[in-house]
Structures are given as C-alpha cells and as structure tokens.
C-alpha cells in the first residue's frame, strides 16, 4: 500500500485465515464445451467455462471454510504451507483470491477483461513488491496477536514423520520506487512512502514458557 501525507500514519494490521487447499472438482469435457464443427466458438466457450469454474471454486472454498471451523484444517492459512520441500508455486487460494478481486473490479465481459489486463495497457503498480516462500528457520521469531514474541517452529510433527512450515511473504521491493516514494504521487505536494504491511496467519509456535501451540502471528503480506 502507498502511504500518502505528512506526517505518515501507522498502518493497521488486518487479520486473515483460510484453508490450505480445498478439494478441486470440475465437471464436463471439451465435447460439452463446443461442437465438432465450430472450433472458434469452442475456444470462446472454453474460456468462459474456465472463468465460471474458478468462480465456483471460490464459492466452494467459502462453504468449506464455514463447515470446518472447528477442525484441524482450519489451522492452516492460504499463506502457510506444510511440506517436505520448498513449494514451487504461490498458494492456490492466493491466486484464486487475486483473480476474484480482479474480476470483481472489472465487472465486465470475459473478452473486455482480457483486453483490459493492466499488463496489456502498460500500467505499473504504485509500489513494487516481491513475494517468496520463507521457512521458519529464516523467520525464527514472530509477534502474536497479544503482542508477545514467540518462536516459530521449523518442523511440524505428522503421523508419518515431520513437515516443514513455509510462509508465503510479500514485501516492498528494495529496488524501484520503494525509497523514492510511491509511483504517480506528485512529490511537489505530497510526501509518500511504500511500506510493507502485515496480516495474521496461523502457525505452530512456542512461547517463552515453552508452551507449543497454534497461534496467529504476523507476517509480511503486501506493499
């Protein structure tokens, strides 16, 4: 986010939490999407169906969340992953939520949405950011909801061994306009600064009394 004004105001912390990966189910096949003699219409129908499937997945994810509030699965966030190796892609729900936000903002036909893609128009974000998976070994400590500093455990015990905790963090890029101010802000009238903001996610931690448990901790989630 871009903080604009002088003096600067503190950014409030937003809470969030969601399931790690709900089951994905799709229906239909290519034959149901287009006729054998109409390839052009088939491709258009396929694109529209893909958009419809994504929106259904988002709705299904919300239902799954509400039905599993008291289960262990609710302990995981879309930005937290338990894995034996470094994840190769961003969290699935993270991508779906980003796509949903884009569709809601566009509120137009699929064809217009594709042509209005910011990448096609050469638009640039106000603040540049970078996202990557980090381990508990890199984080070591974090601040929980009570303001206490807790130790982030690197490994989580599971029935067949142990898995590592990975966190998908987003922060302001050290290059570009991060130090010079927000892009597009008139420096003659405003002081601006790109700042990394945080949100809460659930993670396995240990407090200063050696008590281990799942707690909400703050991690970098946006710029």
From Swiss-Prot:
Entry's Gene Ontology BP terms: cell surface receptor protein tyrosine kinase signaling pathway; modulation of chemical synaptic transmission; negative regulation of neuron apoptotic process; nerve development; nerve growth factor signaling pathway; neuron projection morphogenesis
Designated name of the protein: Neurotrophic factor BDNF precursor form
UniProt-listed SUPFAM superfamilies: Cystine-knot cytokines
Pfam family of the protein (one): NGF
Family the entry assigns: Belongs to the NGF-beta family.
Keywords, in A-Z order: Cleavage on pair of basic residues, Disulfide bond, Glycoprotein, Growth factor, Secreted, Signal
Gene3D superfamilies referenced in this protein's UniProt entry, alphabetically: Cystine-knot cytokines
Positions annotated as glycosylated: 107
PROSITE patterns documented for this protein: NGF_1, NGF_2
Subcellular location, record wording: Secreted
SMART domains given in the database record: NGF
Function statement: Promotes the survival of neuronal populations that are all located either in the central nervous system or directly connected to it.
Signal peptide: 1-5
GO cellular component assignments: axon; dendrite; extracellular space; synaptic vesicle
Propeptide positions: 6-114
UniProt xrefs under PANTHER family: BRAIN-DERIVED NEUROTROPHIC FACTOR (PTHR11589:SF3), NERVE GROWTH FACTOR NGF -RELATED (PTHR11589)
Molecular-function annotations in GO: growth factor activity; nerve growth factor receptor binding
Disulfide bonds: 127-194, 172-223
């Amino acid at each position: 986010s871009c903080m604009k004004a002088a003096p600067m105001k503190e950014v409030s912390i937003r809470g969030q939490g969601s399931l790690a990966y709900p089951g994905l189910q799709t229906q239909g096949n290519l034959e149901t999407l287009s006729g054998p003699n109409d390839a052009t219409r088939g491709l258009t129908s396929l694109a529209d169906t893909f958009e419809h499937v994504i929106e259904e997945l988002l709705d299904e994810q919300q239902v799954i969340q509400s039905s599993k509030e008291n289960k262990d699965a609710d302990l995981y966030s879309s930005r937290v992953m338990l894995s034996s190796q470094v994840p190769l892609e961003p969290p699935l729900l993270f991508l779906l939520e980003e796509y949903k936000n884009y569709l809601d903002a566009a509120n137009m036909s699929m064809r217009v949405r594709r042509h209005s893609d910011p990448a096609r128009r050469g638009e640039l974000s106000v603040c540049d950011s970078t996202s990557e998976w980090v381990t508990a070994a890199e984080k070591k400590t974090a601040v929980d909801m009570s303001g206490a500093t807790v130790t982030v455990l690197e490994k989580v015990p599971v029935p067949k061994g142990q898995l590592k905790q990975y966190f998908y963090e987003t922060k302001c890029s050290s290059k570009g306009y991060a130090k010079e101010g927000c892009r597009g802000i008139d420096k003659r009238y405003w002081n601006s600064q790109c700042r990394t903001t945080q949100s809460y996610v659930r993670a396995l931690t240990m407090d200063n009394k050696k008590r281990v448990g799942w707690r909400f901790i703050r991690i970098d989630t946006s710029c």
